[in-house]
Amino acid sequence: MAAVSLSVSTVKPLGDRVFVKVSESEEKTAGGILLPDTAKEKPQVGEVVQVGPGKPNEDGSRQAPEVGIGDKVLYSKYAGTDIKLGSDEYVLLSEKDILAIVN
């Protein structure tokens, strides 16, 4: 079996899925205490880096995604599939798991 090299440009989401680069989690508390990796909360904010073509409708057309590349989004805490590429973390989500676009 051949090894596959993954990068952001080689991952193309299908349907209504969205590929999001996860924002860095806080390294320390408001009081200045450094947090170990095990105590950090999973971030729920990230930047959209790839978008699928949209959800197929019954008539064969596609419903265009509401988010686009570059949008900063807030998503459900336990949604999606976590993917690590190099030192960066990503999550592959269904568009319905995105709660809001953050400005």
Curated annotation (Swiss-Prot):
This protein's name: Co-chaperonin GroES
Function (record text): Together with the chaperonin GroEL, plays an essential role in assisting protein folding. The GroEL-GroES system forms a nano-cage that allows encapsulation of the non-native substrate proteins and provides a physical environment optimized to promote and accelerate protein folding. GroES binds to the apical surface of the GroEL ring, thereby capping the opening of the GroEL channel.
InterPro entries in alphabetical order: Chaperonin_GroES, Chaperonin_GroES_sf, Chaprnonin_Cpn10_CS, GroES-like_sf
Species this chain originates from: Synechococcus sp. (strain CC9902)
Description of how the protein assembles with itself and partners: Heptamer of 7 subunits arranged in a ring. Interacts with the chaperonin GroEL.
NCBIfam families: PRK00364.1-6 (NF001530), PRK00364.2-2 (NF001531), PRK00364.2-4 (NF001533), PRK00364.2-5 (NF001534)
Subcellular location: Cytoplasm
SMART domains registered for this protein in UniProt: Cpn10 (SM00883)
A GO biological-process term: chaperone cofactor-dependent protein refolding
GO molecular function terms attached to this record: ATP binding; metal ion binding; protein folding chaperone; protein-folding chaperone binding; unfolded protein binding
Source lineage: Bacteria, Bacillati, Cyanobacteriota, Cyanophyceae, Synechococcales
Keywords: Chaperone, Cytoplasm
